[in-house]
A protein has these predicted regions:
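Short loop-to-alpha-helix "cap/lid" segments that border enzyme active sites
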Residues: 47-53, 57, 99-113
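Short, well-ordered secondary-structure micro-motifs
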Residues: 75-76, 96-98, 130-132, 153
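Alpha/beta catalytic cores of nucleotide-metabolism and tRNA/nucleoside-modifying enzymes
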Residues: 18, 103-195
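Short beta->alpha connector loops at strand-helix junctions that form conserved
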Residues: 66-67, 88-89, 122, 144-145
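Active-site entrance/lid segments in N-terminal catalytic domains of soluble metabolic enzymes
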Residues: 1-79, 91-94
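Glycine-enriched alpha-helix->loop->beta-strand junction motifs that scaffold or abut catalytic
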Residues: 58-62, 78-92, 112-115, 137-141
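Glycine-rich, proline-tolerant flexible connector loops at the mouths of alpha/beta enzymes
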Residues: 36, 89-99, 148-152
Length: 195
């Protein structure tokens, strides 16, 4: 924070944040404590892979499963009818000892990448990270914190600037690797053991 005083100053002068997709829709949610209780009530420990197929049938649309961290779960997701999966350790905030998502990406792509789309979430902080994931077979990446920092400090302009930074970093890295088309980037641009 000391290295980014202007960002801190902007954060101090933004309006209070709320959970806009929950406030007004969930009963008795008025503060973080009640939100935590409500969130805990939304999880059913009895859910199984059989339920995924049933949910897909009821839903009738595309089904994406987030939170996959093993090739075994990836195979179960594919067998259950998922259209895509997202490798995610939820930023490590749920389980501090979880593997990094990029470490498990190659094994999961090898197991199911020809059957369903594989995306990656968690740990993306630069355009170079995005390029590494694409080189290892991910269809794309998801990014949360970087956009939230930009949004918090500068609103929509901050999000736009974040996108520009990530794009420019990825574009520059591709150029250094001798590529102009992200669809043609493969593992050959990576030094084994550096991801």
């Amino acid at each position: 924070l000391a290295l980014r005083p202007q960002w801190c100053w902007h954060m101090l002068h933004t309006k209070r944040r709320t959970f806009g997709n929950i406030v007004g829709h969930a009963k008795n949610v008025s503060d973080l404590s009640s939100l935590s209780s409500w969130t805990s009530e939304q999880f059913d420990p009895r859910l199984s892979w059989d339920d995924v197929a049933r949910i897909k049938d009821l839903w009738g649309g595309k089904l994406i499963i987030k939170g996959i961290m093993t090739s075994e779960d990836a195979e179960k997701a594919a067998q259950s009818g998922a259209d895509a999966l997202i490798i995610s350790n939820h930023g490590g905030r749920q389980l501090d000892g979880a593997l990094s998502t990029i470490k498990v990406l190659p094994e999961i792509v090898s197991a199911v990448g020809s059957q369903i789309e594989v995306w990656l979430d968690s740990g993306i902080v630069s355009g170079q990270d995005i390029l590494k994931c694409m080189a290892l077979g991910a269809k794309g990446t998801m990014i949360g914190k970087a956009f939230l920092y930009g949004l918090g400090a500068y609103g929509e302009d901050g999000v736009r600037r974040c996108l520009e930074i990530l794009y420019n970093e990825m574009d520059t890295t591709m150029a250094f690797c001798g590529h102009t088309d992200i669809k043609k980037v493969g593992k050959e641009i990576l030094v084994p053991g550096t991801f």
